[in-house]
Regions:
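A detector for small-residue-rich transmembrane helices and their helix-helix packing motifs
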Residues: 1-145
Length: 145
């Protein structure tokens, strides 16, 4: 069962959460408009591959840690992540402030990506999705509320 809302009011408009959701949705719609082979190329190019990260360290492969957070593998993958970000992100953004929240979001995504890379260092399967960053937001919500 998916939650639809929480009962904690906020004092500020969650502009960072809204922007992250809008960016992810726009990128997914772009992915959806592509041919299968083109979408596969995008995921292969911009998804984070642990093996590449360790074998060929460099700016391009480090960039994929962040670019992978905006790609999603399907409609339910996107909806699940964005729903949880919408419900819980607004309270964390309100508590932290916009700039700190954005940094926190990316640090959570970075920590999740590096954790995955350390567990599966030989994997050349692209890791995509905002799940790691959103999990960090959800964890902080559980700690605060």
């Amino acid at each position: 069962m998916f939650p639809l809302k929480d009962d904690n009011p906020t004092q500020t408009k969650p502009i960072v959460s809204i922007a992250l959701i809008a960016i992810c949705v726009c990128i997914f719609l772009y992915q959806f408009s592509l041919l299968h082979s083109e979408n596969t190329f995008i995921i292969d190019s911009l998804g984070m591959k642990p093996k590449e990260l360790f074998l060929n360290p460099g700016l391009t492969n480090y960039f994929t840690i962040f670019s992978s957070m905006f790609l999603h593998g399907g409609f339910m993958h996107l909806i699940g992540n964005m729903l949880f970000l919408w419900i819980y992100g607004n309270n964390i953004e309100d508590a932290m402030g916009h700039t700190k929240f954005l940094l926190f979001y990316f640090v959570c995504g970075l920590a999740a990506a590096l954790s995955q890379a350390l567990v599966t260092p030989n994997s050349d399967i692209p890791m995509i999705g905002a799940s790691g960053a959103v999990s960090g937001v959800l964890s902080s919500y559980l700690l605060l509320y």
